[in-house]
From Swiss-Prot:
This protein is one of many from the eggshell of the silk moth. Belongs to the chorion protein family. This is Chorion class B protein M2807. One of its GO terms (biological process) is chorion-containing eggshell formation. Residues 1-11 are annotated as: Left arm. Keywords: Repeat. GO terms for molecular function: structural constituent of egg chorion. Residues 81-119 are annotated as: Right arm (Gly-rich tandem repeats). One of its GO terms (cellular component) is egg chorion. It comes from the Eukaryota.
């Protein structure tokens, strides 16, 4: 075997520092001085977990409250990655008369990566 890690294998060595920053939420915004009661439904994949912001002053008499819920409470990434399939040089395998191809095609010997999204 060669040196180095392949697809699906852990790497050993120094740490890997990562810095990330989420994009600002877009697509859904409610801003008003009124009171909203009820349910706001959002379907689809959202690029953020959720935010709630209260700005301004609450009156000295009364209450202020934010109730926020998101699904069943299980927050996570549901799907990530590519297909893992690729088209490439067919190395002689392809459609042709008598089992002989023209040398190029989508076929058995094509290079398409390792199928895990890293190659």
């Amino acid at each position: 075997g060669g040196l180095g890690g392949g697809c699906g294998r852990g790497f050993s060595g120094g740490g890997l520092p990562v810095a990330t920053a989420s994009a600002a939420p877009t697509g859904l915004g409610i801003a008003s001085e009124n009171r909203y009661e009820g349910t706001v439904g959002v379907c689809g994949n959202l690029p953020f977990l959720g935010t709630a912001d209260v700005a301004g002053e609450f009156p000295t008499a009364g209450i202020g409250e934010i109730d926020y819920g998101c699904g069943n409470g299980a927050v996570g990434i549901t799907r990530e990655g590519g297909l893992g399939y690729g088209a490439g040089y067919g190395d002689g395998y392809g459609l042709g008369y008598g089992g002989y191809g023209g040398g190029y095609g989508l076929g058995y010997g094509g290079y398409g990566g390792c199928g895990c999204g890293c190659g």
